[in-house]
Design a protein with these regions (language model features):
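Short, glycine/acidic-enriched loop or turn micro-motifs at the edges of active sites
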Residues: 32, 55, 81, 127-128
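SAM cofactor-binding core of SAM-dependent methyltransferases
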Residues: 4-55
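N-terminal Rossmann-like NAD(P) cofactor-binding module of classical short-chain dehydrogenase/reductase
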Residues: 4, 74-76, 122
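Glycine-rich, histidine-containing beta strand-loop boundary motifs that form or position
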Residues: 28, 79, 124-125
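Class I S-adenosyl-L-methionine
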Residues: 59-72, 84-218
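Active-site glycine-centered loops adjacent to acidic/histidine catalytic or metal-binding residues
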Residues: 9, 78, 162
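Short, structured active-site "lid" loops
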Residues: 40-78, 181
């Protein structure tokens, strides 16, 4: 199973994808510090240029990653979260939501969906991405409906708000997860495994041990 990644940052999500059996073919990342980190730690990855998803979406084709149309298993990314944050709500102009210029990469993300037609699409963002007065959930669903009409695909979009602590991560981290499946199937969301017995941060840190601490490089 192969995946193309958008907005990798420090590749935390990719560790989970790799543990689930995915191979990362290429990634797009705008932040220069994150790009340097990826090149140092992921020298087998293709770091796609230019580092701008809007520009890349206009030119990138499946063949550039050695794929045929519809051959990509998963297109995965996290569109900019600032337009859907509580900080944006408290700002002078309040929530701009999809009208915020920082939300525009989402359209480029969806353009890449139409270009690659992956079997699965995964997006992660703040809870207000799919709930509240500035939610873009309906806009995203409408865009997938348009993709279906133009490409004769059958994407079905599902969303949920999940807390990482409910699945064994020693941190309360609620995030909106959006999944689209090309085969016309609804997402079956996993049942929480640690909802009543969360892992404590001390337990996780204590288990590391001094011998597992990596040596600094660079």
């Amino acid at each position: 199973a192969v995946v193309a990644r958008l907005a990798c940052f420090a590749d935390g999500l990719d560790l989970g994808l790799e543990a689930a059996g995915f191979e990362v073919l290429g990634c797009i990342e705008h932040d220069q510090v994150a790009r340097r980190s990826l090149k140092l730690n992921r020298d087998d990855w293709r770091i796609i240029d230019p580092p701008d998803i809007t520009a890349v979406a206009e030119v990138l084709q499946p063949s550039d990653l050695g794929l045929k149309p519809s051959e990509l298993t998963l297109l995965c990314g996290a569109p900019p979260c600032q337009p859907y944050s509580k900080a944006a709500m408290w700002a002078r102009n309040a929530w701009a939501g999809f009208d915020d210029d920082r939300a525009k990469p989402l359209l480029s993300y969806l353009k890449l969906v139409e270009t690659f037609l992956p079997r699965f699409v995964l997006m992660e963002n703040l809870p207000c991405f799919v709930t509240g007065p500035r939610s873009v959930a309906q806009r995203v669903a409408d865009e997938f409906d348009s993709i279906n009409e133009r490409t004769r695909s059958n994407y079905v979009v599902s969303s949920a708000i999940l807390d990482a602590a409910d699945f064994g991560v020693p941190q309360r981290r609620r995030r909106a997860i959006v999944v689209a499946i090309r085969d016309g199937l609804d997402m079956v969301w996993p049942e929480p495994t640690h909802a009543h017995a969360p892992v404590r941060a001390w337990d996780a840190l204590h288990a590391v041990g001094q011998e597992d601490v990596p040596s600094p490089v660079g």
